[in-house]
Amino acid sequence: MIRYVLVIITCFLVAAKSHVTIGPVPNNLGFPDRSILLALVAPTCEPELEGLVDECVNNVTIRNVCYDCFREGLTKVYSYCCHKYNHMYEWCLEYFSGEMK
């Protein structure tokens, strides 16, 4: 239950950040507060991903978190969600790039 609350909070923060950011974004693989988002997403992703095969597509919660992170340019979080457990980073990159077009 706590994991799902964290997911909702994370999605809200990512959505709010996209509306609040004004001016140039620093060129450091994402926004300045990406470590905060990573701290929120990491505990959520870990139990959900462990032992599952095609998590980026099959699990709606994790797919949405990964997609939001990818869309916001938070590549460190995106890589954590899709690559660390599944070694699917390239596949996910193509999948989400296609979704964004």
Swiss-Prot record:
**Assigned keywords, A-Z:** Disulfide bond, Secreted, Signal
Post-translational changes noted in the entry? Contains 3 disulfide bonds.
Q: Which organism is it from?
A: Lychas mucronatus (Chinese swimming scorpion)
Tell me where the transmembrane regions lie. Answer: none
* Tissue-specificity statement: Expressed by the venom gland.
The places in or outside the cell where this protein is found are: Secreted
Q: Which residues form the signal peptide?
A: 1-16
Gene Ontology CC annotations of this record:
extracellular region
Note the SS bond partners: none
By what name is this protein known? Venom protein 214
